[in-house]
Design a protein with these regions (language model features):
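General small-molecule cofactor/ligand-binding pocket signal
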Residues: 39, 70, 141-143
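Residues at the C-termini of beta-strands that transition into short coil/loop
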Residues: 42, 73, 146
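Short, charged/polar low-complexity linear motifs in solvent-exposed/disordered segments
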Residues: 31-32, 74-75, 96-97, 130, ...
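Acidic, PIN/NYN-like endoribonuclease modules and their adjacent C-terminal/linker elements
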Residues: 2, 10, 18, 45-46, ...
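Short, well-structured N-terminal submotif of metal-dependent ribonuclease cores
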Residues: 1-40, 47-61, 67, 85-91, ...
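Active-site neighborhoods of divalent-metal-dependent phosphate/nucleic-acid chemistry enzymes
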Residues: 69-127, 149
Length: 154
């Protein structure tokens, strides 16, 4: 069974970022080859509205059969608010929490992000998973693209 990964906006932006492209591009190649199913949301689309055109195009190059598109709903908003209420992150990071909530609710295998401050961070990951368990949701694995590529792909 193919892995289903939820990507946040930082991963799309990482496609052209000199610091992250060496790990981001092989990940997108895996998606294009159908080795991975990518999950993204209308939140990602909203966050990309002011991005350069070439960044917006990254998502458009992915084959539709390798994509799951999801939308923000009341349950995702409620779960994101629980992360804030439980002090996993501050309220200014609500959209990061929405990404975590959407991935949790869609039962993604992994959330992939380059956001080390609010997402890919051991303390934050423990916090998100603590809230998930407290409210009856599954734990979620959170990684950077670097952890998902095969080094022979790089």
């Amino acid at each position: 069974m193919k892995q289903r990964i939820y990507i946040d906006t930082s991963v799309v932006g990482g496609f052209y970022d000199i610091e992250f492209m060496d790990y981001t591009r092989p990940l997108f190649d895996k998606i294009k080859r159908g080795e991975i199913i990518v999950i993204y949301s209308n939140l990602l689309e909203k966050e990309l509205q002011n991005a350069p055109e070439k960044v917006k195009e990254v998502i458009k190059t992915l084959p539709s059969e390798n994509i799951e598109y999801i939308e923000i709903n009341d349950e995702s908003i409620d779960l994101a608010q629980k992360y804030v209420d439980e002090n996993v992150v501050g309220k200014s990071s609500f959209e990061d929490c929405l990404h975590i909530a959407l991935a949790t609710l869609t039962r993604a295998d992994i959330i992939v992000s380059w956001n080390f401050k609010h997402v890919v961070n051991v303390t934050r990951i423990r916090g998100y998973n603590s809230v998930n368990l407290k409210y009856g949701y599954p734990q979620i694995d959170i990684r950077s693209p670097r952890e998902l590529i095969d080094y022979e792909d790089k």
